[in-house]
UniProtKB/Swiss-Prot annotation, chain A:
Coiled coil: none annotated. Transmembrane segments: none annotated. The lineage of its organism: Eukaryota, Metazoa, Ecdysozoa, Arthropoda, Hexapoda. Acts as a sulfur carrier required for molybdopterin biosynthesis. Component of the molybdopterin synthase complex that catalyzes the conversion of precursor Z into molybdopterin by mediating the incorporation of 2 sulfur atoms into precursor Z to generate a dithiolene group. In the complex, serves as sulfur donor by being thiocarboxylated (-COSH) at its C-terminus by MOCS3. After interaction with Mocs2B, the sulfur is then transferred to precursor Z to form molybdopterin. GO terms for molecular function: molybdopterin synthase activity; nucleotide binding. It comes from the Eukaryota. The modification Glycyl adenylate is found at G90. It comes from Drosophila yakuba. The keyword Nucleotide-binding applies. Belongs to the MoaD family. MOCS2A subfamily. This is Molybdopterin synthase sulfur carrier subunit. The gene is Mocs2A. The modification 1-thioglycine is found at G90. C-terminal thiocarboxylation occurs in 2 steps, it is first acyl-adenylated (-COAMP) via the hesA/moeB/thiF part of MOCS3, then thiocarboxylated (-COSH) via the rhodanese domain of MOCS3. Pathway: Cofactor biosynthesis; molybdopterin biosynthesis.
Curated annotation (Swiss-Prot), chain B:
InterPro entries: MOCS3/Uba4, Rhodanese-like_dom, Rhodanese-like_dom_sf, ThiF/MoeB/HesA, ThiF_NAD_FAD-bd, Ubiquitin-activating_enz. Its cofactor is Zn(2+). Plays a central role in 2-thiolation of mcm(5)S(2)U at tRNA wobble positions of cytosolic tRNA(Lys), tRNA(Glu) and tRNA(Gln). Also essential during biosynthesis of the molybdenum cofactor. Acts by mediating the C-terminal thiocarboxylation of sulfur carriers URM1 and MOCS2A. Its N-terminus first activates URM1 and MOCS2A as acyl-adenylates (-COAMP), then the persulfide sulfur on the catalytic cysteine is transferred to URM1 and MOCS2A to form thiocarboxylation (-COSH) of their C-terminus. The modification Phosphothreonine is found at T62. It comes from Drosophila yakuba. This is Adenylyltransferase and sulfurtransferase MOCS3. Pathway: tRNA modification; 5-methoxycarbonylmethyl-2-thiouridine-tRNA biosynthesis; Cofactor biosynthesis; molybdopterin biosynthesis. Binds 1 zinc ion per subunit. GO terms for molecular function: ATP binding; metal ion binding; molybdopterin-synthase adenylyltransferase activity; molybdopterin-synthase sulfurtransferase activity; thiosulfate-cyanide sulfurtransferase activity; URM1 activating enzyme activity. GO terms for cellular component: cytosol. The active site is at C248 (glycyl thioester intermediate), C410 (cysteine persulfide intermediate). The gene is Uba4. It catalyses: [molybdopterin-synthase sulfur-carrier protein]-C-terminal Gly-Gly + ATP + H(+) = [molybdopterin-synthase sulfur-carrier protein]-C-terminal Gly-Gly-AMP + diphosphate; [molybdopterin-synthase sulfur-carrier protein]-C-terminal Gly-Gly-AMP + S-sulfanyl-L-cysteinyl-[cysteine desulfurase] + AH2 = [molybdopterin-synthase sulfur-carrier protein]-C-terminal-Gly-aminoethanethioate + L-cysteinyl-[cysteine desulfurase] + A + AMP + 2 H(+).
Amino acid sequence: MNADGPVVNVHVLFFAKSRELANTPRSKVDLPTEITASDLLELLVSKFGLTPIRDNLILAHNESYIDNLSERILFKEGDELAIIPPLSGG
Amino acid sequence: MMESEVDSEQSRLKREIAELRAALNRKEQCLRELEASVSSDASAEEQVVGNALESPGRAVHTKLTNDDIARYSRQLILPDFGVQGQLKLKNSSVLIVGLGGLGCPAAQYLAAAGCGRLGLIDYDEVERSNFHRQILHSESRCGMSKAESARIALLELNPHCEIHCHSRLLYSQNALHIIRGYDVVLDCSDNVPTRYLLSDACVMLRKPLVSGSALKMDGQLTVYNYGNGPCYRCIYPVPPPPEAVTNCGDGGVLGAVTGTIGAMQALEAIKVIVGLGDVLAGRLLIFDGSSGLFRNIRIRSKRPNCHVCSAQPLITELIDYEMFCGMHATDKDNPLQLLSTDERLSVKDYHAKLQAQPHLLIDVRPTAEFEICQLPEAVNVPLVEILDDSYLKRFGKQLEDKELPIILLCRRGNDSQIAVQHVRNRFPMHSVRDLIGGLHAWTNSVDPSFPIY
């Protein structure tokens, strides 16, 4: 990960199980302006304790699903990330 | 009689009456099923005789009756819906899988709106803990099959709706046969294996799947397998580990939250049938009931290498979904067996031998549950505080005494076993045990007036 480049502050929203694991509904993180999706996932999983659901979540950047983990994500100040695990109750 | 004896006699009688009523409903259900199977055998024979083994042709409605016009007038005058929309609905069939918190409101709105034929699948029976969210069931139908109970309520709402009950668990061997007969499927289930089963089956049969789910204050909704939209596996190729899945019985849920999602499932089904508006496919609606916020997340289109819905599928017939997910296709809890019998204590033994002696009784349920009911000497230390050792500070002095027995307790005797393992590692010289069956066992074996939730 490019640790020396410019960083921006990004909002992170947690839903369902991820909210319990992160112990908060929302947070903010400093992220590099450019990062691969897999590095981003790794970073969020370790920072917020999401290991149990790391393979079962939707990661959305500005309300769009990140479907390819090799994709490079570009962030700007104030962007929003959402972590959405499946819900199965009914 | 003393006041407490009167209380306990009252609650015993009430419970017995409720059990008898439930037993009566179950017997009536058996009779209905027997009668239904006899009559369906007879009609199958007639069909063979008449050489009409194909599914019986249904008459297509081309006109609304005067009753239809009066009944549906408020939606008929919607320009995008109109007579053609009503006729499409009248000629449509929808299968609702699960008649719980989502299925009840969904079925209610579909029947009320004039959906011609509804199929209802649920293996479960009505019980009191359902009523706060499963709004078709009622006190007098405790013990009855949920599908049957829903049918009775729906026919009262709209006698023109044709309703078929499937009072059994949906699984790989019966799913295709049942689903084939319907135009649209609603996933109102409460467990992960059924969600994969329904998604795969709907891909194979090319049926749109309106999928809703809810837990605590959260809800999710999307339509799978519609247009170029994805299936459940495109989004979640790997099932979650069982320990990351919470059911409504453990996590809780508000009826107004399941009601919101269930009503929206009915809405999406109507849009699919009528061809109205923009169907919620390729988008996931996230409802956060605590903040009142709805979000739409653009989800992917079909995954090009999806094992089921891609052009070259690896899975072409239904599999064993309980094995695939490592979970049961119900939301019922299975008792854990983490401890050997000498590490545990029955509630009767505790009551008879230990309760009057000095001991430390720790109730490891979450605080919200402890507030519902608790044993007199119990102190509340939620399981998380046991596991992160924050309880040590609170009991510093008491825990120095190796002679003081420690008893751990929870609702059903699962979490208490996890707690025993943890506390015992830290205090190997102490007597650390849990109560088998937890508070449920306490009510059943010691004090029938103690509440059950």
